[in-house]
């Protein structure tokens, strides 16, 4: 009898597993077509929809009907209370689209770092090792910009990335939230995706690349996007991730990196962070959209080094107002080895310690290196024990406010 119950439960589960995929895929496709997006331009669409469906089915979670205004739930899974704001999802289907980080689908020349294998269970294991209870997932470079110059595929890829991220966040609500990918430089489509990701899928912010098809974030055509975001109501969080410095020369995309001896993520990503935040400053994008807060990767990369250089020589009129913004609406993640020495350069600008956040860059930085980085934070003499605890487990609460509901 017991055996019989077990069999019928298994059969039922199999039937459900068979029935549910179609409906999730249908729902995703019908919302995409409602928003003018043709997902079928990606020839891997069926695999991607199957992967997203599998994510929901792992724990029998429903596809979101409407997440509007629902604050995401954040728990502490009892493994420490550390919050990771710089963490990447890298599902197998995405590694097929973009095998190299910083490269793109048509560029298998090894110019980027080969994207590491990743899955939810290895990510959860990693979190357990470090004592991280919650991670905000985003896709790393090239994110939705894997098909340079191809609007339809960029827009479709952004949508599917966001559906996949929402599936992780829905399925593991105590462990994950997400930053949505945006199909810039296509501003109108990015505004549509922004509203969908934030209002319907429940993204806690957006992840922008340092440049989108060679355009830095202060680019004129992006202003309506900043306007739309700032006008969504309440605080908006923009996480910026460095990417390859793309130049379009004579209709050909080339990475503007004359130094090819090490991969672009090592040095160019720091330069990229500097370029785009200088651009956001000089165009006064950061001045004009006052609801918008920025998370800077790697405690700003090479950006802090450039501040005096640029704003004490040219555009001196922006110096004080910019520093004021860097000290209030800018937040600085610790990802990769930043607390051995680099942190001193940032803090020299009187950046409040309450704006320091913890980030890992997993899976691009291994658990062993992350542990060493963690130790360097703990050994850093410039922060008190309380300030270190806040960096790891509290400052993000001030950043996200009512976007996250703390258990
Ligand atoms: C997840 O990734 C880890 C590390 O790459 C691997 O050992 C493991 O087999 C993977 N698990 C699944 C379910 O794919
Ligand atoms: C651009 O392409 C045209 C036509 O192929 C060629 O004549 C020209 O030299 C190219 N310019 C550069 C800068 O490569
Ligand atoms: C911000 O406002 C200033 C005027 O105060 C204007 O000159 C500048 O172009 C604006 N920049 C953006 C990106 O809106």
Short names for language-model regions:
Residues 1-22:
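Fungal secretory targeting signals
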Residues 20-81, 92-134, 163-170, 192-196, ...:
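Mid-to-C-terminal alpha-helical segments outside catalytic/metal-binding sites
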Residues 33, 55, 79, 91-117, ...:
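Active-site gating loops and adjacent loop-to-helix segments of metal-dependent hydrolytic enzymes
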Residues 83-87, 135-137, 177-180, 206-208, ...:
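Hydrophobic faces of well-ordered beta-strands that scaffold small-molecule active sites
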Residues 93-96, 249-257, 300-315, 342-347, ...:
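Histidine/acidic-residue-rich catalytic or RNA/ligand-binding cores of hydrolases
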Residues 139-276:
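Active-site gating/metal-coordination segments in enzymes
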Residues 241-242, 247-249, 294-302, 335, ...:
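Short acidic/histidine-rich active-site segments
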Residues 281-327:
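Aromatic-lined glycan-binding groove of carbohydrate-active enzymes
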């Amino acid at each position: 009898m017991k055996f019989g119950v077990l069999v019928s439960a298994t059969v039922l589960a199999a039937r459900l597993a068979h029935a549910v995929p179609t409906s999730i895929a249908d729902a995703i496709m019908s919302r995409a077509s409602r928003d003018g997006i043709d997902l079928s331009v990606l020839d891997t669409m069926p695999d991607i929809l199957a992967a997203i469906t599998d994510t929901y089915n792992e724990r029998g979670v429903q596809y979101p009907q409407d997440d509007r205004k629902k604050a995401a739930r954040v728990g502490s899974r009892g493994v420490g209370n550390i919050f990771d704001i710089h963490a990447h999802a890298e599902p197998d289907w995405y590694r097929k689209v973009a095998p190299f980080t910083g490269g793109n689908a048509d560029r298998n020349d090894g110019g980027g770092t080969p994207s590491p294998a990743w899955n939810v269970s290895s990510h959860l294991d990693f979190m357990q090792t470090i004592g991280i209870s919650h991670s905000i997932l985003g896709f790393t470079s090239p994110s939705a910009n894997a098909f340079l110059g191809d609007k339809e595929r960029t827009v479709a890829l952004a949508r599917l990335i966001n559906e996949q991220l929402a599936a992780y966040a829905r399925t593991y609500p105590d462990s994950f939230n997400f930053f949505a990918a945006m199909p810039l430089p296509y501003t109108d489509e990015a505004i549509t995706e922004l509203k969908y990701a934030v209002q319907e899928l429940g993204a806690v912010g957006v992840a922008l690349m340092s440049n989108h098809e060679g355009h830095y974030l202060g680019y004129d055509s992006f202003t309506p996007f900043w306007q739309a975001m700032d006008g969504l109501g309440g605080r908006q969080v923009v996480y910026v991730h460095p990417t390859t410095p793309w130049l379009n020369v004579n209709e050909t995309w080339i990475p503007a990196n004359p130094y090819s001896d090490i991969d672009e993520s090592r040095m160019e990503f720091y330069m990229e962070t500097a370029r785009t935040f200088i651009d956001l400053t000089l165009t006064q994008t950061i001045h004009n959209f006052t609801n918008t807060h920025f998370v800077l990767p790697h405690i700003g990369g090479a950006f802090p080094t450039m501040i005096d250089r640029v704003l004490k020589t040219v555009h001196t009129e922006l110096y004080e107002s910019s520093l004021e913004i860097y000290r209030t609406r800018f937040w600085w993640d610790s990802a990769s080895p930043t607390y051995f020495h680099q942190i001193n350069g940032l803090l020299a600008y009187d950046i409040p310690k309450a704006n320091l956040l913890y980030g890992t860059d997993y899976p691009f930085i291994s658990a062993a290196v992350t542990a060493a980085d963690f130790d360097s934070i703990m050994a850093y003499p410039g922060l008190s024990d309380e300030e270190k605890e806040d960096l790891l487990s509290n400052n993000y609460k001030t950043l996200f406010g009512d976007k996250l509901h703390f258990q």
